[in-house]
């Protein structure tokens, strides 16, 4: 009997149906000599620092660097029940072998291996490696199971990625948090260089100084020809005025036939980019929608970095294209002879081929698919048609005209064969897209022009323009930048380039938003003030996109067995150790960047009595000047940090639960002045200063009876 372990219940159900394991048990399915169960994502994770040493529990410079000699793992508390089921099944005497059926990729391999190892399983391991959840693909996959050892290098690469992220995250975050005090400054192996790219772009935008320039226009015979950029408006007006009612001589005409090749098929990153550009979907949303379609058997495996199909998929591609035209996706009747050969290239298919629809699109009721998923399915279908379509061909005309010794230029474009763009245009007309229309090039037909002909100038004008700053990143352009990071410094034979992988980039972006370092403004991704300051203080070794891209490339080499895992981890450990040695102290001015005072604690404001910093202490807010000013309590109630901040700014605060003779009550406290106080405790007189408040009472809500 074989135990099959999938990544999630829905996938396990699909596999069990094909295998004939139809009897439902507690946490698994059984039948036909198979047990089919599942993980729930990661069941096992790396242990926290305090699990290794008690000293590592405290955030202090002295405890750094934190580098475990032997890595420890622990079962996640919220998935412990399913882990126990899997452990019991692995040790079931009926089980002869275990089949890893988690997602066929680096992370899926890690999810299974950590569970398998944690359970102490030693039974033979096999690997199911498929790119589609169609029944035929699952059946073929089980007929061609591979030994688990074939994927040992992939597992080592996944483990290196996890341990490297832990080392850089734990040490980097703790180091810069304890140095700068105040709030936690989260550092990540991939998220920090991604943030650095956003900050670099934002700095260029903020420092950009726009400059006006002018262009003189001459118009006649349907033409609008323009001069070069002119910095002086008066000069532009003089040039335009000199050509009024004049004659323009055509001095140059260049006509060229140009073409745009069909696009490649989608890998995950290009799909995420288009979904963001056309529909405003975040990278994470697109991955979730595509994963759902994959589990519904409607598209192939989503976490791929390939844009081709393998050479043996020619028949599959033809059948899917026919299915697209026979489904409800595209109702337009067109004569189409797809060029399948151009999307086939086994040499450029890594673990998985490009994302395409499956034959299930003609078997299932597509009207039942949620709208967001339907948009992704339609995108994938449309891209398959575009990728196998004909070239988009157009005629380009560029002409120069001379009038009164000034050269004017005009250009035109005339499409004579729309080719693959026919499908793209039809797709865009079928959906309301959020595409920036300024990025699309319009067709502009020119009248017939010949060198030596003259054109009467019917009208002139001067237009004003301004130089433009770089554009803010959108998720579309950020994903592209992450994918290309470090490319200019890498040779052409390097396979993996960029920050993260197609499977991880969405989570990296979401983490930056969640941690408060990046905010979304419509489609734009903009670093927050904290994000800008964080990148300002971090060294290149943790924020350089190129260095991180180098690491990602090395992880790929680990997965191929070309670099030892120990070599990769040794480099990470050395970097972390050097980081701690190099950065051991910062100035008070630098600490103040993140709201920390000399003590390294978060500053809430200035003391109203002595002007010293009021900081957040272990037992509440207090004045570092030790002037006796009580700022952490008001009328016997301990104040929150936000209430203290408001008081120090002279604002009124709402305090609930104040004690009175008739019970507790709520009131607004408005600071008016400072007064002395004194009381005796345990025979000792305690004196100091406190706010004198004016009170306002909230209006009670009146209940309207019938």
Per-region residue spans from a language model:
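Conserved short loop/turn motifs at secondary-structure junctions
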Residues: 1, 101-104, 181-184, 255-264, ...
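Intrinsically disordered, low-complexity regulatory segments
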Residues: 1-162, 166, 432, 469
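Basic, low-complexity terminal or inter-domain segments flanking catalytic cores
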Residues: 2-3, 25, 79, 90, ...
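Amphipathic alpha-helical transducer elements in NTP-driven molecular machines
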Residues: 9-16, 33-36, 40, 76-87, ...
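NTP-handling and nucleic-acid-processing catalytic cores
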Residues: 11-16, 180-212, 217, 224, ...
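C-terminal or mid-to-C-terminal helical accessory/interaction module adjacent to the motor/catalytic core
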Residues: 93, 137-220, 255-259
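Metal- or metallocofactor-binding catalytic centers and their adjacent structured scaffolds
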Residues: 233-266, 272
């Amino acid at each position: 009997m074989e135990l099959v372990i999938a990544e999630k219940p829905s996938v396990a159900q699909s596999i069990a149906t094909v295998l004939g394991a139809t009897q439902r048990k507690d946490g698994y399915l059984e039948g036909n000599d198979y047990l089919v169960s599942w993980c729930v994502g990661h069941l096992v994770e790396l242990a926290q620092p305090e699990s290794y040493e008690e000293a590592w529990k405290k955030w202090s410079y002295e405890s750094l660097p934190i580098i475990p000699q032997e890595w420890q793992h622990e079962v996640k508390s919220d998935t412990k029940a399913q882990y126990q089921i899997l452990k019991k099944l692995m040790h079931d005497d009926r089980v002869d072998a275990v089949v890893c059926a988690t997602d066929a990729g680096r992370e899926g391999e890690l999810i299974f291996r950590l569970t398998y190892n944690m359970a102490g399983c030693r039974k033979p391991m096999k690997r199911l490696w498929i790119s589609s959840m169609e029944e035929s693909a699952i059946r073929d996959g089980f007929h061609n199971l591979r030994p688990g050892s074939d994927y040992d290098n992939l597992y080592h690469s996944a483990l290196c990625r996890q341990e490297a992220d832990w080392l850089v995250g734990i040490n980097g975050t703790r180091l810069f948090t304890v140095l700068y005090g105040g709030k936690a400054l989260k550092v990540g192996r991939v998220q920090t260089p991604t943030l650095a790219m956003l900050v670099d772009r934002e700095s260029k935008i903020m420092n950009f100084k726009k400059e006006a320039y002018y262009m003189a226009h001459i118009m006649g015979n349907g033409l609008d020809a323009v001069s070069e950029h002119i910095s002086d408006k008066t000069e532009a007006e003089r040039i335009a005025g000199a050509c009024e009612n004049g004659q323009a001589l055509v001095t140059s005409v260049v006509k060229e036939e140009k073409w745009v090749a069909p696009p490649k098929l989608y890998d995950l990153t290009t799909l995420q980019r288009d979904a963001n550009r056309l529909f405003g979907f975040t990278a994470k949303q697109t991955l979730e929608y595509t994963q759902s379609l994959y589990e519904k058997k409607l598209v192939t495996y989503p976490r791929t970095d390939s844009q081709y199909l393998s050479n043996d998929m020619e028949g599959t591609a033809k059948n899917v294209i026919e299915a697209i035209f026979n489904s409800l996706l595209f109702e337009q009747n067109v004569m189409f002879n797809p060029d399948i050969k151009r999307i086939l290239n086994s040499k450029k298919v890594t673990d998985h081929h490009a994302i395409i629809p499956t034959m299930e699109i003609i078997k299932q009721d597509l009207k039942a698919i949620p709208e967001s998923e339907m948009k992704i399915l339609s995108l994938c279908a449309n891209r398959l048609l575009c990728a196998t379509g004909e070239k988009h061909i157009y005629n380009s005309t560029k002409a120069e005209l001379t009038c009164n010794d000034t050269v004017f230029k005009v250009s035109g474009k005339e499409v004579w064969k729309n080719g693959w763009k026919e499908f793209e245009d039809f797709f865009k007309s079928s959906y309301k897209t959020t595409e920036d229309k300024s990025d699309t090039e319009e067709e502009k037909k020119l009248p017939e022009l010949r060198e030596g002909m003259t054109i009467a100038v019917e009208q002139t004008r001067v237009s004003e323009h301004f130089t433009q700053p770089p554009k803010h990143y959108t998720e579309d352009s950020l994903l592209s930048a992450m994918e290309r990071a470090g490319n200019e410094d890498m040779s052409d034979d390097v396979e993996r380039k960029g920050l993260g992988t197609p499977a991880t980039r969405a989570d990296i972006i979401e983490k930056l938003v969640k941690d408060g370092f990046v905010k979304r403004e419509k489609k734009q991704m903009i670093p927050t003030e904290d994000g800008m300051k964080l990148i300002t203080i971090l060294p290149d070794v943790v924020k350089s996109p190129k260095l991180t891209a180098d690491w990602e490339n090395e992880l790929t080499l680990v997965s191929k067995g070309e670099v030892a895992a120990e070599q990769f981890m040794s480099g990470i450990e050395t970097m972390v150790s050097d980081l701690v040695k190099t950065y051991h102290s910062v100035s008070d001015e630098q600490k103040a960047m993140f709201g920390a005072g000399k003590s390294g604690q978060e500053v809430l404001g200035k003391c109203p009595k002595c002007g010293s910093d009021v900081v957040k202490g272990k037992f509440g807010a207090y004045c570092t000047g030790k002037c006796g000013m009580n700022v952490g309590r008001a009328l016997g109630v301990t104040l929150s940090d936000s209430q203290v901040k408001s008081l120090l700014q002279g604002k009124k605060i709402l305090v609930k639960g104040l004690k009175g003779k008739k019970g507790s009550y709520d009131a607004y406290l408005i600071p008016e002045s400072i007064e002395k106080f004194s009381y005796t405790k345990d025979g000792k007189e305690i004196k100091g200063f406190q706010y004198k408040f004016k009170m306002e009472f909230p209006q009670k809500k009146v209940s309207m009876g019938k």
